[in-house]
Amino acid sequence: MPLKVIGPYRVLETLGSGGAGTVYRALDRRTTDEVALKLLSAGPARDARAARRLAREFDTLVDLSHPNVVKVFESGVHQGVPYLAMELIEGLTLRHYLDLSSGDRQTPPGSHTPRSPLSVLRTADDDFGPLSRSFSDSMDDSEDSPFDGTFGLEAFAEEAPSEDLESFASSASPHVGIGSDDSLEGFDLPPPMPRPAEPEEEPGRVVREEDLNRPERMGRLKDAMLQICEALAYIHGHGLVHRDLKPSNIMVDDDRQVRLMDFGLAKFLADDAAITEAGKLVGTYRYMAPEQILGEPLDGRADLYSLGVILYELLSGRPPFDAKTPHELWRQVLETEPPPVLALNLHGDPQLARVAHRLIRKEPDDRFQTAEEVYEALSE
């Protein structure tokens, strides 16, 4: 009989698939609640060290409970393959939420208005790490398109990595694996959703200052940043570093509550040396702190750097560095200074700009040292 059950969960459909595994919509047969079920692929699961590390990580994630952090329900192993069950989230990405005009309406609390065909359903893990997608995908995380910020089932499909990225990773470390096609032998589960054609981008599209500086947008931005600081203060207080903080991992639900997601890359601080050895990198390129690029031990200040890149982008309308290749991007992050936010957005908020620039300083000791400090600076 075809196997469509993983532990206590009945698989309903595939939400997305990548080199490290697949995310399913599943039903908890004990409670009848729907969850997002992340199932590791067979290849990584055969790596004993990776499996042990994931087991430790999963145990920690289950213990997290904070209103601004997506809830992980439980972890387990099915036929030797680790899985992670987490809540399904409905809402908008941070970028799309900020782009709502005063005439737009996010679904209010308690509303059950039917969704459009392009659902905004989003789970806690649509990105299985930096090496499972093409470099252009990672670099284009903030590029606008007609679909930007809204996530349907197609948002979980992933492209194969580019040749440039494969050759770069191969030269960087023989231990870095890319785009594995390992599947779960013996599993008769829904196949991954095919990736739809990408919508054409508007040529020469420029973000206008008046759009960036709309009072309602700036109010939402500041409130969202404060909530993110609360989430980071919580996870850092539990000895964790997110390591992959980026706009698509920050959702705003129907109650305007920010939800920090995708802790698939979160690690114990105590395991730092083992995780970064042999050139193994986790995170999305544009948002990586210099010390993360260099493979050095990380603490919460690496997440604060990523937060600074996000804030810089949302204030200026562009990323701090505009390289087209990994080599050039990492050189810029390590060696060059980005243009001042207020040179790109003349009427931007000076206080938020100061916070962004301090967060993205190259030396961790020169940044804010804790999320609580960032919260206080944003509140001034």
Curated annotation (Swiss-Prot):
Pfam families: Pkinase
Gene designation per UniProt: pkn5
Residues bound to ATP: L15, G16, S17, G18, G19, A20, G21, T22, V23, K38
Principal localisation: cytoplasm
Post-translational modification: Autophosphorylated on serine residues.
Coiled-coil blocks: none
Gene3D superfamilies: Phosphorylase Kinase, domain 1 (3.30.200.20), Transferase(Phosphotransferase) domain 1 (1.10.510.10)
Record's keyword annotation contains Isomerase: no
Protein EC: 2.7.11.1
Segments of skewed composition (Polar residues): 103-116
Location of the active site: D244 (proton acceptor)
Enzymatic class: transferase
Keywords noted in UniProt: ATP-binding, Cytoplasm, Kinase, Nucleotide-binding, Phosphoprotein, Serine/threonine-protein kinase, Transferase
One GO MF term: protein serine/threonine kinase activity
SUPFAM superfamilies reported for this sequence: Protein kinase-like (PK-like)
Domain Protein kinase: 9-378
Skewed-composition ranges (Basic and acidic residues): 202-214
Family in the record: Belongs to the protein kinase superfamily. Ser/Thr protein kinase family.
Reaction catalysed by this enzyme: L-seryl-[protein] + ATP = O-phospho-L-seryl-[protein] + ADP + H(+); L-threonyl-[protein] + ATP = O-phospho-L-threonyl-[protein] + ADP + H(+)
Region (Disordered): 100-150, 162-214
UniProt function note: Pkn5 and pkn6 may have reciprocal roles in growth and development. Pkn5 may be a kinase that negatively regulates development.
Protein name per the record: Serine/threonine-protein kinase pkn5
Cellular-component GO terms for this entry: cytoplasm
Compartment(s): Cytoplasm
Source species: Myxococcus xanthus
